[in-house]
Amino acid sequence: GEKLTSPDHYILKQSVSEIVKVNTPAEFRIEILPTDGYEMEVEAPINLKFATENYPDLIFDKVSFSKKDLNDIKRPVFSGKITPKKAGEYNIKGELSFVVCTSTICEPKKTDINLHIKAE
């Protein structure tokens, strides 16, 4: 396959159902793709946490995710549902932390997540 490259040694892929009806879940998916010969450090924590206190009108089916929520630790994909109780636009923030390594070096990563949902 093609060799993925990034100065951060990983690429983040985020997707979300951007427009939903009120009381209908928006599904999100957040994928970490290590690049440049780096791989996920499977012994290290892989955590995703949403800042839910800012969003009283959203129902998160889960707020905090860890390795046990992943099907494949080497190809991590976090997915879940966020349901808006009121119409409006929401910028949902979270934080993702993980470690990528080569055979000789490890780099802890921490990155902001930003999902945008519009509820009609």
PLM regions with names:
Residues 1-120:
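Extracellular/lumen-exposed scaffold segments
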